[in-house]
Each structure stands twice: as C-alpha cells, then as structure tokens.
Curated annotation (Swiss-Prot):
Keyword terms of this UniProt record: Acyltransferase, Transferase
Organism in which the protein naturally occurs: Aspergillus versicolor
Acyltransferase recorded as keyword: yes
The name this protein goes by in its record: Arginine N-acetyltransferase avaD
Protein purpose: Arginine N-acetyltransferase; part of the cluster that mediates the biosynthesis of a highly modified cyclo-arginine-tryptophan dipeptide (cRW). Within the pathway, avaD catalyzes the N-acetylation of the guanidine group. The first step of the pathway is perfornmed by the arginine-containing cyclodipeptide synthase (RCPDS) avaA that acts as the scaffold-generating enzyme and is responsible for formation of the cyclo-Arg-Trp (cRW) diketopiperazine.
Gene of this entry: avaD
UniProt keyword Transferase present: yes
C-alpha cells in the first residue's frame, strides 16, 4: 500500500483547526495517553481494558504504515498559540470479505488487521475499518466528527479499498441496556416514520447513515471482557456483589444479569466466583467506496 496523502483529500476544517496523523505528529498523538487529557475518559475504562485492546491497540502506531491511518484534529489557541488534540479517528487497513464481516466485530477486525500485517500482508487489505471516533466535549459544535468520517471515507477511496467498514457502537444504547441491539438499531427518531425511513433514533448511527453508510448485520461479540467484581468497581463504581444481593434477575446458570453505567448490555455476574463477564454487541455499518 502506498502512503496516504491528507493534503490531496480536499477536506475543509474550521479556522484554527488542522488535520494530522500519528505518523506525521507522533508528539501530539502521545498526549492522548495522558490520563489528564480531556479525551482520556470519553471511552468507558472497561472497553479500553479488554485483552484484545491491550494487546493490539499500541501496534496501530508501532507499525509506521498504520500510524498514517490514526487521525487527529489539532486546535491552536489564538491567545497562547498552544496546540492540542481535540478529536481523533482510529482505523486499520484489513483484508476481510465484505460479505463476511466477523461476529467478533471491533476486536476481530483489529486483531485481523494487525496479524495480517505481521504475516507480511499475505492477503492485501481490501477494507479500511474504523475503530473509533472521539471528539473533546468542548469542541463538539464544530462538526469535527463529520470531518473524521469524511476523511476516513476519502482515505479508503484514495487507497482503492472496497469500503470503509465500521463496527459501530451506538451512542445512546447505554441508556437502554435491556433492549436487544437488533431491535434498538431499527428505532426511528420519529416513531411515526415509515419503515424505510433512515432517520435513526441513535445519533451516531444516524450520522453514518446520512453519509451513505448501510447497516449490514449485528456483531454480537464485538468486545468481550471478564473481570473480578473488585476490578469492575474500580472501572465503574458499581459494587456488583451488593447489586446481586438486591434482587437482580438470576439465570438458570446462576448468573446475575445487571446493567452498569455506560455499558450497552448488562454484565453477567457469577456470585460464586465474583467474576462478571461483559459481551458487547455492535452493528456493522458499511460505507461502499467502489
């Protein structure tokens, strides 16, 4: 694959903002790992702590080619000229048949992209998979998420990939943890909308559909993690043992199902081992390019 060229994409940004990659500005990308960075807490800690994430995430910048696909939007303060990262978009080139996107969603596509590269790209990447788009709260009225989506689509086109694919984590699903994702993704912003109306209830899904993305299937096991109740308390502040004793539903296997903050579905807690498992579904969205 040839190197990418951001300048040729023709992406317009608001005054004071610039588009960069981790390859071009590793110094700025490193600031995202500071626990005090305003964007460091925007993803739930249990999501960033999955075994797959911990093993593979750093390799997105360790591999020079992939570092070019880690986008940043920088903002320069007018008064003190200080530059900071206010949005980012992570992605990985990957080989995967477009009609066979994995049930393992986010974790599977990240792992496949890295391992295929390490194997010498025996199968040339045919897709660009988005892995996440994050925008600092103070800059969310500037259309930066739109810019990142447009840039990812343009990069996929520049590299002659078949599509940009997204194991999408619906923004508002955590407010409805007991609703199956298969049902949630078909909710409409207007409850009286026609069945074919694409105005989705979920804002992040709605945005992708507005750019031509198409929902193709659910990824039922997009992120998976199992940890002791003490670890879950550190991550979420929830005392799962106490919640389990308070009368939450118990399955035939003796597991207690309970919602936790920022999770899309309930965790499954085992009162005997005090281990809770979380298996998060996402929805595959495809942005066709060619």
């Amino acid at each position: 694959m040839a190197g990418i060229d951001l300048q040729s994409l023709g992406i317009s940004l608001p005054p004071g903002y610039s588009l960069q990659t981790a390859a071009a500005r590793p110094d700025m990308y490193e600031t995202l790992f500071d626990p005090e960075h305003p964007m460091s807490s925007l993803w739930p800690q249990f999501i960033t702590s999955t075994p797959v994430s911990e093993k593979y995430w750093s390799q997105l910048t360790d591999i020079p080619l992939f570092a070019s696909y880690q986008l940043m939007i920088l903002h320069r303060d007018v008064e003190n000229k200080h530059e900071s990262v206010v949005a980012c978009g992570n992605s990985v080139p990957v080989y995967c048949p477009l009609n066979d996107l994995p049930d393992g969603g986010w974790e599977a596509i990240l792992q496949t992209g890295i391992e295929n590269y390490r194997a010498g790209h025996k199968q040339h990447p045919n897709l660009l998979s988005a892995l996440g788009v994050t925008v600092a709260s103070a800059h969310r009225q500037q259309g930066l998420a739109d810019i990142v989506i447009q840039t990812l689509r343009a990069l996929a086109n520049q590299a002659h990939f078949e599509a940009l694919v997204v194991p999408l984590r619906p923004t508002k699903k955590s407010e409805h943890p007991m609703v199956p994702l298969e049902e949630y993704v078909h909710w409409k912003l207007d409850e009286h909308a026609r069945p074919d109306d694409q105005v989705s209830y979920d804002p992040w899904l709605r945005k992708h559909l507005s750019y031509g993305g198409q929902m193709v299937r659910i990824a039922p096991r997009s992120m998976t993690i199992a940890a002791h109740a003490d670890q879950w308390k550190d991550w979420t502040g929830c005392d799962l043992a106490a919640l389990a004793e308070s009368g939450s539903d118990t399955s035939s296997k003796g597991l207690v199902e309970m919602p936790i903050p920022r999770a899309l579905v309930p965790v499954q807690y085992d009162p005997v081992s005090k281990v809770a498992s979380y298996v998060e579904p996402n929805v595959w969205v495809v942005h066709p390019i060619h």
